[in-house]
Amino acid sequence: MTRKLEIPESRDLPDWSHIGGGKVRELYVHRQYKNILLMFASNRVSAFDFVLEPEIPEKGRMLTQMSNWWFRKLPAENHLLENYDQELYRDLASHIPSHILERSTICRKMDIIPFEFVIRGYLTGSAWADYLENNTVYGIKLKGKFRQGDRLPGPIFTPTTKSRTKDTPVRYEDLVNAIGLSHAQQLREMCTDYYTTAEQIARNKGLIIADAKFEFGIAEGKVYLADELLTADSARYWDINSWGQFDLPIERRLDSFDKQAVRDWVKCNSGKNITPQNITPLRLPQELIQTVYKKYKTLLAKLTG
């Protein structure tokens, strides 16, 4: 079955050429300024590298707002055009319909570093699975005993491949071989600093950032934050009060403001193996869509309110 993807009409973006897209976003280049891109965030939802139906209402707008909020909060140079040329940004934005602009990021074109950089501050997800099996977190031995959801002694840098299918962990030594020691050290320091700063900001908002994914690009020899930043799709958020209540069931203590409920539902309804044949016919129930929508909406309000 072929799915119809949500893509803005060409008449709404006459100054832009569509050059590609992924599971949840579409990418455009400006017809005159070839070094300027527009990333459009759709309402599509994916799990296990498959796009599912139906879409989540307002998802693109909410995640774009989260990302832009963090780009302005963190003391980091990033790919946003408005930070580089405000006059050009205002001119380009003025020709984009508001219903598209609110879900779009206008940015400078960069050479994207072909890795994703995950920072883990708490023992959860694949880090917890690794700890249970090997008593390590991606090769790092932890001293003492830890429970699921515990704060780690310090943020752990765990890069992965950047793939259209399944991302796989990358050893630091292999990262050095791929991009050089200087860039590897710089990116590890940047990720650790950005995560530490963001986690403190989030804590002041009543939230915990358990882990987060960062992406970077290079322009004119400098490294910049790129892609989306600390959205509900690229970071794992918990409620700080629930996290601290150890008498609660673990699924309530570590209930995250993201699409984990979608992943759990797919696991339960796709049989033993998560394959295209098993996932494609699935249609997410409306109750689940509303649950995820409310999580995104609550997170956005907590962060920006």
Swiss-Prot record:
GO CC terms in record: cytoplasm
Catalysed reaction equations from the record: 5-amino-1-(5-phospho-D-ribosyl)imidazole-4-carboxylate + L-aspartate + ATP = (2S)-2-[5-amino-1-(5-phospho-beta-D-ribosyl)imidazole-4-carboxamido]succinate + ADP + phosphate + 2 H(+)
Pfam family, one: SAICAR_synt
Gene of this entry: purC
Family: Belongs to the SAICAR synthetase family.
Pathway(s) of this molecule: Purine metabolism; IMP biosynthesis via de novo pathway; 5-amino-1-(5-phospho-D-ribosyl)imidazole-4-carboxamide from 5-amino-1-(5-phospho-D-ribosyl)imidazole-4-carboxylate: step 1/2
Cited PROSITE patterns: SAICAR_SYNTHETASE_1 (PS01057), SAICAR_SYNTHETASE_2 (PS01058)
SUPFAM superfamilies with a match to the protein in the record: SAICAR synthase-like
Protein's GO biological process: 'de novo' IMP biosynthetic process
Keywords on record: ATP-binding, Ligase, Nucleotide-binding, Purine biosynthesis
Keyword Nucleotide-binding: yes
Source organism of the structure: Tropheryma whipplei (strain Twist)
Enzyme class: ligase
GO molecular function annotations of the record: ATP binding; phosphoribosylaminoimidazolesuccinocarboxamide synthase activity
HAMAP family xrefs: SAICAR_synth (MF_00137)
Enzyme Commission number: 6.3.2.6
InterPro entries according to UniProt: SAICAR_synt/ADE2_N, SAICAR_synthetase_CS
CDD domains per UniProt: SAICAR_synt_Sc (cd01414)
Protein name: Phosphoribosylaminoimidazole-succinocarboxamide synthase
Protein's UniProt keywords contain ATP-binding: yes
